[in-house]
A protein has these predicted regions:
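Serine/threonine-enriched low-complexity regions used as flexible
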Residues: 63, 135, 141-168
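Short solvent-exposed strand-capping/beta-turn motif centered on an Asx-Ser/Thr pair
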Residues: 66-72, 83-85, 137-139
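Low-complexity, intrinsically disordered segments enriched in Ser/Thr together with acidic residues
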Residues: 120-141
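C-terminal motif of bacterial Sec signal peptides marking the signal peptidase cleavage site
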Residues: 22-25
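Low-complexity, acidic Ser/Thr/Pro/Gly-rich terminal tails and inter-domain linkers that flank the onset
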Residues: 28-58, 173-194
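A surface/secretory-pathway sequence property marking extracellular, secreted
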Residues: 80-115, 123
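Short beta-strand elements of extracellular/lumenal beta-sandwich folds
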Residues: 54-74
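Bacterial N-terminal signal peptides that target proteins for export
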Residues: 2-14
Length: 194
């Protein structure tokens, strides 16, 4: 009996030590450890999204950003906060409801963040375009807010025109009537009429 109690204590001590080692290995370096600190000058040279849309109609949202500074932007990113809206129904497990469905997002820009896309470093004088193809699924008037960042973790700050955060918004009216479309027999292209 005494021997099995001793084995039990050793097993418990060994298990505790292994658990401590395992938890200690989870830490690692901070997520933003490799992101440089600083301010990076950029300019939004294009931002467009149709003001009048129809439900079930695919449209493009475009934001193009130029590095107007003299140093490389570490990881050019754009956050779009308004592809979904909060439902007022109190008993929903997830109150987020789509306003637009993202059909395609900027190529190679997916991140771990739900509403942020990053296209990597941007050298001085260069421009990068973020293009989303989205389809409206909720009629009404909606505001789409966006902002540009120089990195994903907050240490690299994008600025435009001095100390301004490069950001903007679109006000969009989505009609509850789907747009009419047909196939042009001569070209095979889809022709939409509103």
């Amino acid at each position: 009996m005494e021997g099995s109690a001793l084995i039990g204590r050793r097993t418990l001590t060994l298990g505790t030590a292994l658990a401590a080692l395992t938890l200690g290995a989870c830490g690692g370096t901070a997520q933003d450890a490799k992101e440089p600190s600083g301010t990076f000058e950029v300019s939004v040279v294009e931002s467009k999204f149709p003001q009048k849309q129809h439900i079930s109609q695919a449209e493009q949202l475009v934001i193009a950003v130029k590095n107007t500074g003299n140093k490389t932007v570490p990881d050019l990113a754009v956050t779009v906060d308004s592809f979904a809206a909060k439902s007022e129904q109190p008993e929903l497990a997830d109150p987020s409801r789509a306003v637009w469905v993202v059909d395609t997002s900027p190529a190679g820009g997916d991140t771990a963040y739900v509403n942020t896309w990053a296209l990597g470093p941007l050298k001085a004088g260069k421009t990068r375009r973020f293009v989303w193809k989205v389809t409206a699924v909720k009629p009404g008037t909606h505001t789409v807010k966006w902002r540009v960042a120089a990195g994903l973790n907050g240490k690299a700050q994008a600025r435009s025109g001095g100390d301004q955060v490069p950001q903007g918004q679109f006000t969009v009216d989505v009609s509850d009537k789907p747009s009419q479309s047909r196939v042009d027999p001569a070209t095979g292209e889809i022709v939409r009429s509103n």
